[in-house]
Amino acid sequence: MQDETVDLWATDEVHFQQHGSRCQMWIPPETKDPVLRHAPTRRSVGYFGAVRLRDGRFQFCREADKFNGATFFAFMKSLRRTSIRTGRRVVVITDNARYHHARLHKEWREVHAEDFALDYLPPYSPELNPIERVWKLTRRRCLHNRYFPDLDNVIAAVEAEFDQWTNRNETLRRLCAIT
């Protein structure tokens, strides 16, 4: 049974690397061995992402430097602003990254405990977080078997996919379905 007074969000962080990934694919038999270009770099771009499990709405934030307590705090506040307009309580499912427990936002969470809560997954269990499926789908649609000459091309490809998901989205709702 669904609780209509709660917005349940699954959230996580991810890095998409410029070098992409190669996977098996079909090619016509008359084509000689194809050459897939591959950027010899480890440059990457990081994102916070969250899926509202009720309707598949996706929210993301690109991080320029690194993930830490301050950047996670800003993302939590944006999730709360999104859901508080509907009058629902926000419950965020997240992993046990150290900065998710930061003292920086502990007081804020206590002040807003009536309408905001973090719910932690068991340690070392990413398979329980529904948003991991979104990261896998994003990699498959945007990064597999593609060459990116620079990081800006990676950002453009990933954010074009993300922009399709910012409103209610049946694809993500089904992908992340708990009920």
Give the residues covered by each predicted segment.
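Extended, low-complexity cationic-aromatic segments
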Residues: M1-K77
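Short, well-ordered coil/turn elements that cap or connect secondary structure elements
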Residues: D3, G87, V111-D115
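C-terminal anion-handling pockets and recognition modules
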Residues: T5-L8, I131-T179
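Mobile genetic element proteins and their domesticated derivatives, centered on retroelements
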Residues: D12, G49, M76, D95, ...
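Acidic/histidine-rich, metal-coordinating catalytic segments
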Residues: D12, G87-H101, Y124, N129
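RNase H-like polynucleotidyl transferase catalytic core
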Residues: D33-T41, E110-P130, Y147
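Short, basic/hydrophobic alpha-helical segments
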Residues: T71-V91
